């Protein structure tokens, strides 16, 4: 495996808190559950948008047989309730995952056995109801819910419980599911390293020197020149990754043929959602174009525990099955789609270095995207969390390094490590990308390495309903769905955040679910509104997710060179505003460049490439120090810094990119910018179309030189060097070639008879010969003619000579020699300087007109002096294409808010920036530096007719439970001074005088008692009574009191008897008082001990 491969060692499903190594993937769900610290069992239920059970519902979670119909609804709602979790999933079909021509192929040992179109009906993405901006859901609904739920800073995984009860269930119900948090995953094996196989010369080097496969030191030899990259800009555009997904035979056997397809697509659905997050800084669409399920081993594909060898085999195999009859995004005649990257999912417990199980979960070449044999990855199946492994590995193919490896992400005070983290901890967020990952992929795409992702393949499109559900079902109906036909809404203030309903027991309750979007609402500032994303907004308005917009360009940076043509750059960011609530990332140019310091360097200055190579003289290479010179041979990238070790027979790439402004090749004005060769006009302006003519005159018409061409044949061989042709000083485009493949040798001689170059038999010829102010390129091989070429101009006259050997040569020569001044035509056409740009920003134009000039003094003369046949065409180019600074754009005043008396009128005031002559973009008000013009102003009309006036609302009556507020509505004169009969005002415009309200729950009915009445007797024991009534909180009679708590209405009482004083002073006679008839009872009940009874029944009680 190439040394640029990265290995993702993620333990089980995100592996939070990983200080361990995964030694094997879970082979059964029982093994997974035993490894969890905690999990819950839930029964997901198909519901409506309010969480109410569906009265009639199509089958949910039912395993679809081949050919069977499938649920094709674009919007679904599921309730997932467990002891400590409660989710209401709002799901929308994922139309962007599958290309329109995606197929599922089943392969046996002999190859493709059969195929069919893939079914995308099970793939959904969305959010929790009422939490669109803070939650994420990606699931498959075939055979149960398989997927991820992200909410409240926690990630949950859900999947059907294998072996659960199979009893009868309604069509809207499902079987038991396992719900567990990512943080509950654990594993006993410890190993913190994420292996990266690397070579010693690359250790400690910056990431940009290690992103692509490091080239080895190569011996000198014959190389062929690679074509240069075309001109590209740093542009944010939508990319499409057409993906081949392959599941090996162990995957098919483990998950079963009937379920493996939807299982794999559920994983890829999560992968696609990860790449759509705006934190990536680019719009990347993962599209599955081909799904291959292997039922048997393939003859040329070897998959084992050894990840490196398996990946090598898979990369070659997937390249071999690519159709060569397709072009771009066209579907080949054989119906097999091409792909940009290939993903292998295996049940093997893979390991990077050995054919035994260990902790490796994924492997992919870094920077391999769009390279046929390197855009591939192997991923171990560990459940739904395999999606994070696949996204991580595809990130590597985009040139991403691990967060914290060769970059600052993850360090203290820096951007935290995220999806590309080598080690996942509790603080790692694997659902977003770090700023380092964003920089890696942006650099990769801007360097032109992702060209295969620009074509847009056909995909399946769906039409979604647009009617707000709250308009179809009002709040009372939503309550009835949840709590029965007698339920209704019972609280009205915060209906958009929580819907409160009367339960069957007549209590006002809520399940914390907001009312459906579109439900009518009312606030202190909004008389009529509707609910939208848990907020009451003016009726009819629909706040949407905010798409990102470009911010202003930064000032131009420093020039990369002080002379010879450098580069200055300016950039902008997608932050005005940043994309929010699922808004799209910006499309367009993110970095621009311009030429600077185009003046020639002083004579004798060191070559710019030589200077960069020499800086590595003090850097050890494989433990030794070398003197480095520029390597000028072929077979290397034009904009990489490839240096030759002086005195040694090898060269190597010392930097992936030269400094901006370095010429791409000798004898060219094109320069390198950000590692790619960009076109430069002969005026040394980046992107200029100005070219040299055949005389090497910038913008010339070719009239300053003439072409000299001929064939020379000497009379006899062996007579020494013979003169072939004299080339005058100033000649350009010199070319000499031996047509007979003879053993002759070429030589150059100056005017002073000095031999500048001599080719002797048997002497190897160098490739580059700096002579006469230019560079001659000498090419000679056993199977090609000897040739000598130079771009020129030469600063001295030269004579071409030939030494003929056994065979007579035939030399073809051609060059453009300057025309003597007196031979020039007196007048000729020339381009005038470019006119001033027609606009200061947002795209203007410049024109370069043609004028007739005198050749002797270059003065302009009348056009008729020049020939009309040779007139040059007028030129035009774009200029000042950068957007204009933000400014306020003011609209016309509206009509007065009132047709009578004093009112206000308004106008639109928008901060916007002109991007081009035909496009303007609205910005946030803070982007405009000038004060905002007024939006409102007063206006005056005729006297107004009478109108309705309202007084303040009364208190809610009754004081508890459902009630009403009242207010007085009067017909008033326009000046509000007189009250008029109601008939003077328009009846249709009369405001409501009552409004429903609800303060609190009313207290229950209670028993009320009166004071106790008088005792029934005047002396002794008797009874007294009181009244007991059941009354409501309003004091009205009620029957709702609890009978068991009813107070008593009667109790015993005792009246004090008057004392009897006998006359006289003698001793009192002991006798019973005649009027007391109960003395026998006093004796019977032993009351004689009491003073009263002893006195009244003295005789009876005597002696007792």
Curated annotation (Swiss-Prot):
Which subcellular locations apply to this protein? Answer: Secreted, Extracellular space, Extracellular matrix
Q: Does the keyword Repeat apply?
A: yes
Q: Please give the GO cellular component terms listed in this UniProt entry.
A: collagen-containing extracellular matrix; extracellular region; microfibril
- PTM section of the record: Glycosylated. Can be O-fucosylated by POFUT2 on a serine or a threonine residue found within the consensus sequence C1-X(2)-(S/T)-C2-G of the TSP type-1 repeat domains where C1 and C2 are the first and second cysteine residue of the repeat, respectively. Fucosylated repeats can then be further glycosylated by the addition of a beta-1,3-glucose residue by the glucosyltransferase, B3GALTL. Fucosylation mediates the efficient secretion of ADAMTS family members.
Q: Which residues cross the membrane?
A: none
Gene of this entry: Adamts10
What PROSITE patterns does the annotation carry? Answer: ADAM_MEPRO, PLAC, TSP1, ZINC_PROTEASE
Name the record gives this protein: A disintegrin and metalloproteinase with thrombospondin motifs 10
Q: What residue stretches are annotated with the Peptidase M12B domain?
A: 239-457
List, from the UniProt record, the residues annotated as the active site of this protein: 393
The major lineage groups are: Eukaryota, Metazoa, Chordata, Craniata, Vertebrata
| Residues covered by region (Spacer) | 706-818
Note on cofactor: Binds 1 zinc ion per subunit.
